[in-house]
Amino acid sequence: MLEVAQVNFIGRKEELNTLEKEFRRDGSFVVIYGRRRIGKTTLIKEFIKDKQAFYFLATEEVESQSMKRLAGVVARVTGNSMLQRVTFTDWLDLFREIANYRPEEKKVLVIDEFPYLVKTNAAFPSILQNAWDEILKDSNVMLILCGSLISMMQKLSLIHISEPTRRS
């Protein structure tokens, strides 16, 4: 489980309820976007605090470093320290590790600041779509993408922080 610092969480009950409903569905893929500093990450951390969650904060770095850091997140959550010593060269392998971990249990994969991954690799949205279609959709994983680059996130437009909608 992800450790979350004690924060006075105020409001956003409607958004939390929407996320909880999505969590109970099979094949749930959610995008949360909005301006910077409006509480997107705080909302997500509040939502995942009592769940099996893989929280990954993307940064501006080379793609191999992002894969290495996500492997570290997966290693920490699964307790499989060997994953930190593996050099992943394919995002799909990392997503398989997440899907295959305790397959009977519902999990949440959060990619926060998603646009940074796209900036590093313009093909990342199609890689993620492939991962969703081939690996994650039929597994016990809820996928949450979050970002502040509104134009990019609107293209994915699955859920807006103040106007929830569902992707079929």
Give, region by region, the residue ranges found by the protein language model:
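Single conserved hydrophobic/aromatic residue that forms the stacking wall/gate
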Residues: 159-168
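Short glycine-rich substrate-engagement loop in P-loop NTPases that contacts/grips substrate
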Residues: 77-101
